[in-house]
From Swiss-Prot:
One of its GO terms (biological process) is gluconeogenesis. Monomer. One of its GO terms (molecular function) is phosphoglycerate kinase activity. It comes from Albidiferax ferrireducens (strain ATCC BAA-621 / DSM 15236 / T118). It comes from the Bacteria. Its main location: cytoplasm. This is Phosphoglycerate kinase. The gene is pgk. Pathway: Carbohydrate degradation; glycolysis; pyruvate from D-glyceraldehyde 3-phosphate: step 2/5. It is found in: Cytoplasm. The keyword Nucleotide-binding applies. ATP binds at K202, E324, G350, G351, D352, T353. It holds the Pfam family PGK.
Length: 397
């Protein structure tokens, strides 16, 4: 990928005294009280910010948070908790600036956080007037938000069209390098885990990966749809019956290549979706009409762990069960530890996956942890992301 790298500009002394606008991904999960529950994305954004400060730049950083209504700012849309956490992690003041589109006062060596960019009218539709105003704020635009690389919005795409210089931050560049290592030229066998509740959003990926991977492990709501497709009963579990033909097509495509989609042989069920629900391990053929499947069973988990330990490359997206509930976390925990113990190059992405990695303390044993959810998925689909398209184009002059 031929893009300008921000690290190169810094090394060449081209950043000193310049106004640098960093589009980061600080979209972190919060509890009902607004406290940040998991700060991986904030931590991941710091190297780029520090690099800009060390190079003598006047630094502006923005991000989206949640799904606010454009033009209607509400207190819960504020990046204030993010500014506070960033200040704690960096050991310096991080002023938060509202209504910043028409101008920001920031000096070299200073860092400011610009309020939630998704509140700006025209952000999502990549409004040209908004993009030009943002581009006018800076000398150098740095895209360091892989999590938004699949969206052509004003703060991720439009500004890159009009800024004097548009480049990739260290996080974005590292994502690109890791993804090409995992997918463009993988060491085999290549095993992908695609799990989570949103089957419809991941079907394209399943179809794309079915032509690339040696094993395609499905979990969560997705596995339920595949179980249905294989003729098993799933009770009242989450599934998408209208997608059965698609699931069968994926199974057939894998089979035609001598590869497989392992269907669970045992599952963990409950009668209600609750942390205190009674967990029952059952054969996959014994699911009752009023059962909810909330995890893969121990036999299935052990079989998958064996496959993962023998893999050359592992792509992991999504927990295989409701790991937030202790009674239904065994499948995800077993798979997490198998990936950690495997000698394979592993790349993992998606918010729930990051939460599982943090819960089981295996950050150091994963080859590369992607901070992008949807963007990571679109790369898996084989798409060219808008961010890479525009940064490549700008690098080519």
């Amino acid at each position: 990928m031929n893009v300008i790298r921000f690290s190169d500009l810094c090394a060449q002394g081209q950043v000193s005294g310049k106004r640098v606008f960093i589009r980061a991904d600080l979209n972190v999960p919060q509890d009902d009280a607004g406290h940040i529950t998991e700060d991986t994305r904030i931590r991941a954004s710091i190297p780029c910010i520090q690099m800009a400060l060390d190079a003598g730049a006047a630094v502006m950083v923005t991000s989206h948070l949640g799904r606010p209504t454009e033009g209607a700012f509400k207190p819960e849309d504020s990046l204030a908790p993010v500014a506070q956490r960033l200040a704690e992690l960096m050991g310096r003041a991080v002023p938060l600036i509202a209504n910043w589109v028409d101008g920001v006062s920031v000096q070299p060596g200073q860092l400011v956080l610009l309020e939630n960019c998704r509140v700006n009218p025209g952000e999502k539709k990549n409004n040209e007037a908004l993009a030009r105003k943002m581009a006018a704020l800076c000398d150098i635009f740095v895209h360091d938000a892989f999590g938004t690389a699949h969206r052509a919005e004003a703060s991720t795409y439009g500004i890159a069209q009009f800024a004097k210089v548009a480049c990739a931050g260290p996080l974005l560049a590292a994502e690109m390098d890791a993804i090409s290592k995992a997918l463009a030229n993988p060491k085999r066998p290549l095993v992908a885990i695609v799990a989570g509740s949103k089957v419809s959003t991941k079907l394209t990926i399943l179809k794309s990966l079915a032509s690339k991977v040696d094993q395609l492990i499905v979990g969560g709501g997705i596995a339920n749809t595949f179980m249905l497709a294989a003729g098993l009963k799933i009770g009242k579990s989450l599934a998408e019956p209208d997608l059965l033909e698609d699931a069968r097509a994926v199974i057939a495509a894998m089979k035609a290549r001598g590869a497989a989609v392992p269907i669970p042989t045992d599952v963990v069920t409950a009668k209600t979706f609750a942390a205190d629900a009674v967990a029952t391990v059952k054969a996959a053929t014994d699911v009752a009409d009023d059962d909810l499947i909330l995890d893969i069973g121990p036999q299935t988990a052990a079989a998958l762990a064996t496959q993962l330990k023998a893999a050359g490359t592992i792509v992991w997206n999504g927990p295989v069960g409701v790991f937030e509930f202790p009674a239904f976390e065994n499948g995800t925990q077993t798979i997490a530890h198998a990936i950690a113990e495997s000698s394979a190059f592993s790349i993992a992405g998606g918010g729930d996956t990051l939460a599982a990695i943090a819960k089981y303390g295996i950050e150091k044993q994963i080859g590369y942890i992607s901070t992008g959810g949807g963007a990571f998925l679109e790369v898996l689909e084989g798409k060219t992301l808008p961010a890479f398209e525009i940064l490549t184009r700008r690098a080519a002059g």
